[in-house]
Amino acid sequence: MPEIDHIGIAVKSIAQARQIYEALGMHVVHEETVEHEHVRTAMIPAGDARIELLEPTTPDSPVGRFLAKRGEGLHHVALHVDDISAALETLKAQGAHLISEDIQIGAGGHFYFFVHPSSTGGVLLEICQDPVSDV
C-alpha cells in the first residue's frame, strides 16, 4: 500500500524557507543538488513523512518555471511504493497522463516518476521508491 513519502514545496530560497520549520523545532536532515533537474533540495522530517523544500538552480528549470508561473507553494505530493516499475506499468495501463514514462533517479538516489495533475485531481503526483540495485 503506498504511503505519503514527502510533500514538495517550491521556494525561492531554502535558507529563508527553512527558518519557519526550524522555529517549530524541525531540522533539515539532508540537502542535495540534483543537477539534471536543476534544483536544490532540503528534506525535513515531519512524522512518518517529510517536507521537501525545492529551490531552482536555474530559472528555466521545472521548479523555476513553476515559481515564475505560480509563486512559492505546494509543488507535489509524493507516494512511496515498493515496486516502482509495477506502479508505472499499472498507471500506463490505466491511461494516466505521465510527465515522463521513464523512471528517473533523484535526491538520495531515490527512483521516481511524475503523474500529471490532469490525472490526479489537480495535484502533481510523484511516485517514488527507495534506492535498490535491481529496478
Regions found by a protein language model. Name each.
Residues K12-M26:
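An N-terminal domain-start capping segment
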Residues A17-I20, A87-L91:
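Hydrophobic side chains in well-ordered alpha-helices
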